[in-house]
Design a protein with these regions (language model features):
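Generic hydrophobic, helix-prone segments enriched in Leu/Val/Ile
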Residues: 98, 223-224, 273
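A conserved mid-domain beta-alpha-beta active-site/ligand-binding segment of alpha/beta enzyme cores
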Residues: 199-256
Length: 279
């Protein structure tokens, strides 16, 4: 592999044939994986598909839990294949399950398989009732070998280290383009570049019910910045202060229209997305 410097502190690998890097993006449907996908396309890489961990339990230390089926909508919007991987959120087994699923993809295969979903695969996708299944949503299959996995991790050493160790075992590169990015500039960049970000949950003092389901504008980011300073929380939500979903982005061809119900306990809240379709 030849290493090329991007001039921005990152190094990018290309194969000796100079073909574009062929990558998968670990996508949750949220803001950081949306940025990671956009970052990959800007480098001219071949994004072979989106991979989403679908947590069936109530929590996970590694992966986002709510609204991750939106990554399937995003994949269809960009005409990319999707690989949903169901896990229970047990930290003793979740990385092993992810690795086993990727092992069947990253090394490629000369066998041609239909991208049509089997009944078992549809069950694994855990598609929410009431969401319109995109007719063009293809299931990711092994074809050409994968060179790297791109992840939207920002400051979680726990997540980054485990992903890097897994990628080393799989024999692929790991890229974290957002690693240690400054939160304020990251949030402003997302909005200015055309990522339509909504807050799907809030759980910190200073963020009330009115933030739930809101599409963030530059003014909203400035307000978030002020609130974060007063209430001492992370403006990018990296401390678990809020979760996000992206309903449109520069790498997507269609927007996602959602219908939701707001739930508020008085101290925290979330939205239940009961309807979604591409428009």
């Amino acid at each position: 592999m030849e290493v090329l410097n991007t001039g921005g502190g990152d190094s990018i690998d290309r194969c000796p044939t100079q073909r574009p890097m062929r990558v998968l993006v670990l996508a949750s449907g949220g803001k950081d994986s949306s940025y990671a996908t956009w970052w990959s396309t800007l480098r001219g890489w071949d994004v072979a598909g989106l991979v989403t961990v679908r947590v069936t339990g109530e929590d996970s230390m590694m992966f986002q839990v709510p609204s991750t089926a939106l990554a399937g909508m995003q994949a269809a919007s960009a005409d990319l294949p999707w690989l949903p991987i169901p896990i229970e959120g047990d930290d003793r087994t979740e990385m092993r399950i992810l690795e086993e699923a990727l092992e069947g993809i990253v090394h490629g295969s000369h066998k041609s398989r239909s991208p049509i979903w089997s009944s078992a695969e549809l069950l694994d996708a855990a598609w929410p009732e009431g969401w319109v299944w995109p007719s063009n949503l293809r299931r990711l299959r092994a074809s050409e070998p994968i060179d790297a996995l791109v992840v939207g991790a920002i400051r979680s050493d726990y997540q980054k280290t485990r992903i890097e160790q897994m990628c080393e075992r799989l024999g692929v590169k790991s890229f974290t383009p957002l690693w240690h990015h400054e939160g304020r500039s990251h949030m402003h960049d997302l909005v200015s570049q055309g990522h339509q970000v909504i807050l799907t949950s809030v759980s910190t003092e200073g963020l009330g019910k009115e933030w739930l389901g809101r599409i963030l504008s530059q003014h909203d980011v400035e307000e978030l910045e002020s609130l974060a300073e007063v209430h001492r929380f992370n403006i990018d939500g990296e401390g678990g202060e809020f979760e996000t979903a992206v309903i449109d982005a520069p790498w997507m061809k269609y927007s996602i229209n959602t219908q939701h119900t707001v739930h508020w306990t008085g101290r925290r809240g979330w939205i239940d997305i009961w309807g979604a379709e591409l428009v």
